[in-house]
């Protein structure tokens, strides 16, 4: 096994900033002064965009790393049967990839939309369950389609009027029950028949049922986009454009969405999601604050009869001020019955540096009780330079500050930093025009050991050769 290279600053080698070239044609990346380099080549960047399990692209989600990056660390630092934890699971990339590789993936998030995506991936409905439920929904729609079509016409013609109110999401109620109003921009986005079907499905799907939850998650992934596989062409698939933009664009262009059948489009989405067999291992999804995830994870693991300590953490803490997960998913959250403003208020992601560092210290302190003695903790931390054109003070060199003020005081052992430049042309935010790629230009991957034993394991695993075939050869017998 090739021994890893650890470059530590010294009087002979230290410069204002250590530098190295990652690959031919790429800019040299900078290491924060004082942090050693962990020589893990970013091979994940050479993989196909949709590398990994077919459940990964269930729905786009901003500020998420690719499945290949998760694999690079899961393959190095865990074995089949180990628990792999992500306390900021987002769309569930780490726990799903862990389950796909025979580990026990555990994801936690405070965002109910992220929780739904994670739960749908680590505890998915079977193809038979999903398709049977979809067929039943189609039959139920056919029975009462006239009532839902009339409701959709009222929603479009008389927005906000009590006569155009709709049933609550997940209530199972019919088109003549009026619980809540519909945002004007929702009516602008869809063809009347498509809107009618969405209103029906929104009422029918119960998110506490695993099969309905899986269908709802798949539906969020086809809600809007620029091809015939999406229910509306008003917006890109990556995120929901601002409501004001939607109103102005629809008025300026006289936008009319083509008619798309919800059941047909969702059926095709299921075909894509089930292109590969379901993961060999089931995982766990938790809804709650990352600062108290450890006890909840251990309790859930024990109840499931699984090991109650994680051997690996792979996570990306929320970026400073950059992403409002409710706001950028307002149409998806409406479909699910969630309040986008309440999500953003709960997440409170607009941290300045010092409160952000204190928050991460609380998270790392809490995690200690769920980690094995030789656990490895991988933190993907982006340098945040701008937020909608405004320079963010203290956003560059964040990994060093996380180590100094959040990880080191809690007894973690530093293995080093791996670097990953963020190519603007490949980011979801490339649609933001001049702002594209400027918010986060470099991800610094901070690799820690829970103890000195974990640090030594992190160093030893850095030089391992990783199998990038999918599924990996070692897993084909699982």
Each PLM stretch: what is its role?
Residues 2-80:
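S-adenosyl-L-methionine
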Residues 70, 82-101, 105-112, 118, ...:
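Conserved proline-anchored active-site loop of SAM-dependent methyltransferases
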Residues 113-204, 338-347:
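Conserved phosphoryl-transfer catalytic core
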Residues 123, 320, 382-386:
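Short "lid" loop at the C-terminus of a central beta-strand within the Rossmann-like core
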Residues 179-315, 320:
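SAM-dependent nucleic-acid methyltransferase catalytic core
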Residues 212, 346-417:
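Conserved Class I SAM-dependent methyltransferase catalytic core
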Residues 295-313, 318-376:
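SAM-dependent methyltransferase catalytic-core segment centered on the flexible catalytic loop
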Residues 395-399, 403, 410-478:
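Class I S-adenosyl-L-methionine
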């Amino acid at each position: 096994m090739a021994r890893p290279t650890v470059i530590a600053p010294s009087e002979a080698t230290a410069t204002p900033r250590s530098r190295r070239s990652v690959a031919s044609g790429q800019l040299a990346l900078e290491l924060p002064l004082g942090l050693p380099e962990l020589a893990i080549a970013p091979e994940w960047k050479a993989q196909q965009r949709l590398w990994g399990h077919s459940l990964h692209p269930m729905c786009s989600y901003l500020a998420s790393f690719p499945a290949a990056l998760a694999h690079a660390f899961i393959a190095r630092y865990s074995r089949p049967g180990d628990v792999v934890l992500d306390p900021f699971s987002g769309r569930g990339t780490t726990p799903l990839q862990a389950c796909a590789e025979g580990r026990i993936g555990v994801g936690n998030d405070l965002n109910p939309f992220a929780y739904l995506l994670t739960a749908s991936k680590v505890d998915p409905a079977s193809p038979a369950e999903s398709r049977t439920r979809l067929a039943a929904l189609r039959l139920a729609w056919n029975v009462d389609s006239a009532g839902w079509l009339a409701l959709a016409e009222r929603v479009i013609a008389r927005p906000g009027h009590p006569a155009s109110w709709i049933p609550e999401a997940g209530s199972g109620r019919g088109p003549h029950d009026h619980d809540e109003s519909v945002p004007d921009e929702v009516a602008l986005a869809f063809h009347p028949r498509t809107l009618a079907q969405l209103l029906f499905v929104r009422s029918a799907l119960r998110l506490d049922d695993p099969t309905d939850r899986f269908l709802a998650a798949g539906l969020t992934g086809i809600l809007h986009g620029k091809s015939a596989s999406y229910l509306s062409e008003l917006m890109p698939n990556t995120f929901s454009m601002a409501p004001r933009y939607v109103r102005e664009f629809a008025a300026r262009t006289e936008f009319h969405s083509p008619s798309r059948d919800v059941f047909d489009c969702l059926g095709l989405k299921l075909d894509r999601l089930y292109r590969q067999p379901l993961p060999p291992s089931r995982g766990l999804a938790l809804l709650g604050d990352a600062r108290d995830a450890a006890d909840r994870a251990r309790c859930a693991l024990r109840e499931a009869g699984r090991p109650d300590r994680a051997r690996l953490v792979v996570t990306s803490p929320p970026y400073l001020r950059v992403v409002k997960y409710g706001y950028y998913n307002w149409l998806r959250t409406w479909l699910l019955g969630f309040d986008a403003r309440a999500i953003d208020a709960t997440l409170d992601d607009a941290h300045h540096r010092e409160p952000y560092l204190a928050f991460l210290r609380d998270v790392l302190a809490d995690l200690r009780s769920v980690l094995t003695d030789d656990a490895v903790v991988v933190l993907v931390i982006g340098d945040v330079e701008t937020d909608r054109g405004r320079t963010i003070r203290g956003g560059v060199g964040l990994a060093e500050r996380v180590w100094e003020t959040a990880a080191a005081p809690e007894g973690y052992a530093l293995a080093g930093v791996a670097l990953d430049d963020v190519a603007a042309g490949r980011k979801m935010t490339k649609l933001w025009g001049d702002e594209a790629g400027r918010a986060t230009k470099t991800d610094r991957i901070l690799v820690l050991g829970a103890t000195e034993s974990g640090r030594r394991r992190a160093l030893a695993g850095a030089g391992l050769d990783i199998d990038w075939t999918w599924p990996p050869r070692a897993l084909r017998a699982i």
